C-alpha cells in the first residue's frame, strides 16, 4: 500500500499468501502516501493503513486512517484520524483492535493510539512506549500481544530493542527482549506463535532473519537469511503458515514457512514497483489466531 521515494504512489497491490505468484492490482489509497507510510494492519474483513508522508507536497505528513474490505478490490476509504500527523508509524492488531504507535514529525513520538476496526472513528489514546524508540520498527502480533521491534532512537540511532503490549488492555509498553542485530525498517510478521523480522538496514541493508516466540519474553534467535536481494522498508504479509516479504526498493517477493527455520524462497515479482515504505497487511496474520 503506497510507498515510494521521492515520488510517492497511491497504488495498492495484493497477493494470495498461500499461492506463490506475482502481485495484482487492488486499487488506490485516497492520497499518495510516501516512503514512511508503513503502518499496515488488518482484521479478518478489513485492511487498514495509517499516517505516512507525501514527499511531492513539501514533505507533508498525514494523520489519515484508511480502510477497505479484503473481499473485494477497489479504492480505500476514509476511516478516521490519528491525533497527530506523522510518518514512520508502527502498527499491530488482533481481530478487533488496531494499535498505532510512535512515528515522527519531525521529532519522534512515543504515543500509542488505537481504533476499534469494526467502527469508523478517530484513534484514541492507548498508552506510551516505555522507551524513546519510536519510529520505523517491525510490527508483530498474536491475538494477545503486539510487539514493536527495533527501529530508530534519536539518541542511539538504530536499535535492537523489542517492546510489547497486551492489545486488549490499555497501558504502556514493556521490555520483551532484543533482536539479534540493530536495525531500522525491517519487514515483520508471523503467526499466533512465532514472530519474524527480516531485512532492514543499519546503515546498509542486511539479509538477516530472526524470530521470537511471542508468548515467551526473551531475545530473538537466528531464523535464516534472505536468499535473493534483501531490501529495507519493504512491506510484508502473513498467513498462519507463511510469511511473505517484499524487497522495498526492488521488485522481488520472497517467503518462508513460519514454523520451519531456513532461508527465503522465491514467491514472485512485484509488477508495479512501489518503492520503500509501502505498508502491508493481511486477513490471516498472527493477531487473528
State what each model feature region is.
Residues 1-289:
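Polar, enzyme-active/binding microenvironments
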Amino acid at each position: 500500500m503506497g510507498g515510494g521515494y521521492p515520488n510517492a504512489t497511491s497504488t495498492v497491490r495484493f497477493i494470495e499468501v498461500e499461492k506463490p505468484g506475482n502481485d495484482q492490482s487492488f486499487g488506490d489509497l485516497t492520497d499518495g502516501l510516501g516512503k514512511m507510510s508503513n503502518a499496515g494492519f488488518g482484521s479478518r474483513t478489513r485492511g487498514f493503513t495509517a499516517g505516512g508522508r507525501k514527499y511531492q507536497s513539501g514533505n507533508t505528513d498525514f494523520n489519515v486512517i484508511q480502510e477497505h474490505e479484503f473481499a473485494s478490490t477497489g479504492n480505500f476509504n476514509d476511516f478516521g484520524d490519528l491525533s497527530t500527523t506523522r510518518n514512520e508509524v508502527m502498527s499491530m492488531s488482533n481481530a478487533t483492535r488496531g494499535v498505532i504507535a510512535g512515528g515522527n514529525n519531525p521529532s519522534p513520538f512515543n504515543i500509542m493510539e488505537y481504533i476499534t476496526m469494526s467502527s469508523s472513528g478517530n484513534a484514541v489514546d492507548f498508552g506510551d512506549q516505555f522507551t524513546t524508540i519510536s519510529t520505523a520498527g517491525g510490527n508483530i502480533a498474536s491475538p494477545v500481544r503486539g510487539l514493536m521491534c527495533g527501529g530508530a532512537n534519536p539518541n542511539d540511532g538504530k536499535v535492537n530493542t523489542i517492546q510489547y503490549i497486551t492489545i486488549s488492555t490499555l497501558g504502556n509498553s514493556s521490555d520483551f527482549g532484543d533482536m539479534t542485530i540493530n536495525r531500522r525498517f525491517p519487514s515483520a510478521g508471523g503467526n499466533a506463535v512465532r514472530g519474524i523480522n527480516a531485512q532492514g538496514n543499519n546503515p546498509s541493508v542486511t539479509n538477516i532473519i530472526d524470530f521470537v516466540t511471542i508468548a515467551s519474553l526473551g531475545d530473538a534467535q537466528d531464523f535464516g537469511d534472505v536468499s535473493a536481494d534483501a531490501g529495507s522498508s519493504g512491506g510484508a504479509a502473513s498467513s498462519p503458515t507463511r510469511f511473505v516479504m517484499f524487497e522495498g526498493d526492488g521488485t522481488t517477493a520472497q517467503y518462508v514457512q513460519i514454523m520451519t527455520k531456513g532461508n527465503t524462497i522465491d514467491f514472485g515479482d512485484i509488477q508495479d514497483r512501489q518503492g520503500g515504505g509501502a505498508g502491508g497487511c493481511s486477513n490471516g496474520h498472527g493477531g487473528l489466531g
